[in-house]
């Protein structure tokens, strides 16, 4: 019995020593910050704030403490300096091994940044040095601030600008003080629904912060991963550097072998790696072997050629299987060995229905797009692929004789504003972000359909939808980040035809946004003009698209007014649209000497009551199907009357007995127009309006 008691006593002492030893050797982590660190506004704050979540993620070998204090500033002369708070003194006394600092949000207050910004770097350095003094071996990370969104009451009066300025200072401070930088902005910037007050993240947001910090502290980014774009049958852009990139655990060696050449790189502290090989001409199939200590992967059937993005709304999304040419297309698809398709389709169509809880949550999580695999063309792979994009890619491959990759991420009903990145709208058009569902920027139909879809959401003000500003960029464009493409084929506008001036402003921003995103300031845009349909605003909208394309650099128009259906916005004759897109690309992007667009009016001159219209691209000018139709003229009163028109060489002579002194002429100005002017290439003339030179 005594022996048993003695052994039990020894065992208990051993366990106690082990526990005490474990506690002594635990890595002490201090989370220093403001209300976001503290967990302001969170239910069950002590369990849901990011330091508490970080403790659970790191485990028992770490001792994570929350030293956040709401409302505090980094600036020592700010309205509530962090260094004057009890939490600061407690954090120093903790003598942490690791320090994570997230400060700066409250420095955007007008009491602080305008007056004391010149001291921000100095004060941050003092804070860093204070922790180093307490523990010279301490590792310190400072954080790029979490976002402040547009609904913040001072967003446009200073907060937006000062937040951006402080972020740049934090970059500089990290570099100058040799501390690691944790980006808390990027993983949350596309998630405004997690910030009810535009400033403080909810529990899900706090978890994202904790996961981001945990990866930065430990270097554990979940092992080797690559974008779905890097897969068998992929197409890569010729004459651009051949770049392979992905994520892996920090510090790992990544060895990439491509065409007999081997490159080795070390994964950065943010988990990113990238290897680049010299640009190549078209060719394939090739393969690449990517190896880390934990995993090896071979990607096969890589082709180098031309890569295009086809995007927009439902007429770009419209599948091959529903088009007029479906039977022939499906039967011959396998005869397109050069064509490689990457279909990003919507998992949740915006039909006239109320979405259930699962769908609402997935949409909020930006999990809208499905597919995401490269496929070669065959009957099964093209049937649900965009008909316009398929015929565009097919025509390019037939002409260029090189592999052609087509990425399609079009989603029906989406608005122009939904495809523009958040930063662009915050700085160039912030008013469109405010309560889009109930404002008057969005098309009434689009807003009503969106509200119908999200009707069962517990908080509709925070519920995301594909039609709202920025959503499609965040769900369907960010997955393409840094992937090289040649250009964009864009077919959208039906959901913005209610406000022509607004669309013109938005489309300019979209081009600017995407050119910045793809790192190509001269990224070509091939724009499909709206077709004919009995909607009253469409003639003027078509003309606006014409004028935009003529004015904007590297932008070319594809006319489709001869293909529409008077009653159905989704006309089925999509093959000519894709082929006309290819003509514009071949001529303007690839320098083919061919006719790529229809007659374009360049001048109007009046002689008495006759109007002489002069055209370019007018070789073989003719009227399809009989007499010329679609012209109208107006006098000083601005009232238009139907006009007679006769073709004379490469000109058209227009007149009306009701307009003795014509001052303006227009063409194809009916919503569903039967205007029929074409050239020898059978390409149609666009809807247009022109003042008459006297």
Regions found by a protein language model. Name each.
Residues 222-250, 300-310, 317, 584-604:
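Non-catalytic, glycine-rich low-complexity segments
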């Amino acid at each position: 019995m005594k022996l048993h008691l003695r052994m039990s006593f020894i065992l208990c002492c051993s366990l106690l020593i082990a526990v005490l030893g474990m506690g002594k050797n635990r890595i002490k982590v201090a989370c220093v910050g403001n209300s976001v660190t503290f967990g302001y506004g969170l239910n069950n704050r002590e369990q849901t704030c990011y330091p508490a979540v970080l403790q659970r993620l790191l485990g028992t070998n770490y001792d994570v403490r929350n030293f956040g204090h709401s409302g505090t500033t980094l600036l020592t002369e700010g309205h509530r300096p962090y260094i004057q708070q009890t939490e600061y003194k407690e954090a120093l006394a903790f003598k942490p091994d690791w320090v994570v600092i997230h400060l700066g949000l409250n420095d955007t207050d007008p009491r602080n940044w305008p007056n004391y910004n010149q001291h921000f770097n100095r004060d941050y350095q003092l804070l860093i040095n204070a922790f180093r003094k307490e523990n010279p071996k301490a590792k310190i990370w400072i954080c790029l601030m979490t976002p402040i969104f547009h609904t913040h009451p001072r967003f446009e009066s200073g907060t937006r600008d000062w937040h951006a300025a402080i972020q740049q200072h934090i970059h500089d401070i990290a570099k100058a003080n040799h501390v690691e930088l944790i980006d808390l902005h990027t993983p949350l910037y596309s998630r405004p629904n997690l910030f009810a007050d535009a400033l403080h993240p909810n529990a899900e947001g706090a978890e994202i912060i904790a996961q981001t910090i945990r990866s930065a502290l430990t270097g554990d980014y979940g092992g080797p991963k690559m974008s779905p774009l890097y897969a068998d049958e992929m197409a890569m852009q010729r004459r651009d550097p051949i770049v392979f990139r992905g994520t892996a655990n920090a510090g790992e060696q990544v060895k990439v072998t491509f065409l007999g050449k081997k490159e080795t790189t070390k994964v950065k502290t943010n988990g990113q790696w990238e290897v680049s090989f010299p640009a190549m001409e078209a060719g394939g199939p090739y393969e690449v072997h990517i190896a880390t200590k934990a995993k090896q992967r071979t990607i096969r059937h890589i082709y180098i050629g031309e890569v295009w993005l086809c995007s927009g709304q439902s007429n770009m999304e419209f599948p091959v299987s529903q088009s007029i040419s479906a039977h022939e297309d499906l039967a011959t698809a396998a005869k397109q060995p050069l064509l490689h398709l990457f279909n990003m389709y919507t998992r949740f169509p915006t039909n006239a229905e109320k979405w259930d809880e699962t769908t609402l949550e997935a949409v909020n999580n930006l999990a809208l797009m499905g597919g995401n695999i490269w496929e070669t063309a065959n009957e099964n792979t093209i049937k649900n692929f965009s008909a316009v994009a398929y015929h565009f890619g097919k025509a390019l491959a037939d002409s260029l004789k090189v592999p052609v990759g087509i990425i399609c991420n079009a989603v029906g009903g989406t608005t122009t504003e939904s495809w523009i990145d958040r930063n662009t709208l915050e700085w160039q058009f912030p008013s469109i972000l405010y309560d889009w569902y109930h404002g008057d920027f969005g098309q009434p139909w689009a807003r009503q359909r969106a509200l119908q879809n999200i009707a069962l959401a517990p908080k509709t003000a925070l519920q995301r939808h594909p039609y709202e500003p920025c959503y499609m960029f965040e769900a369907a464009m960010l997955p393409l980040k840094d992937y090289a493409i040649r250009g964009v084929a864009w077919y959208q506008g039906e959901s913005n035809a209610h406000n022509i001036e607004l669309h013109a402003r938005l489309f300019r921003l979209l081009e600017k946004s995407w050119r910045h995103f793809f790192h190509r300031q001269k990224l070509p845009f091939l724009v499909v003009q709206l077709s004919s349909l009995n909607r009253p605003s469409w003639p003027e909208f078509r003309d606006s698209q014409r004028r935009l394309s003529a004015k904007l650099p590297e932008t070319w128009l594809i006319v489709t007014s001869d293909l529409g259906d008077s009653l159905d916005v989704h006309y089925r004759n999509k093959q000519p649209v894709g082929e006309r897109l290819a003509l514009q690309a071949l001529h303007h992007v690839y320098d083919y000497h061919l006719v790529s667009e229809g007659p374009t009016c360049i001048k109007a001159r009046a002689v008495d009551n006759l109007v002489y219209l002069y055209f370019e691209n007018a070789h073989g000018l003719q009227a399809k199907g009989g007499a010329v139709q679609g012209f109208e003229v107006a006098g000083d009163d601005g009232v238009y009357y139907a006009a007679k028109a006769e073709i004379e060489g490469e000109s058209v002579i227009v007149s009306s007995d009701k307009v003795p002194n014509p001052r303006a002429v227009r063409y194809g100005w009916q919503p569903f127009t039967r205007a029929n002017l074409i050239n020898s290439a059978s390409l149609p003339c666009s809807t247009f309006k022109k003042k008459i030179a006297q």
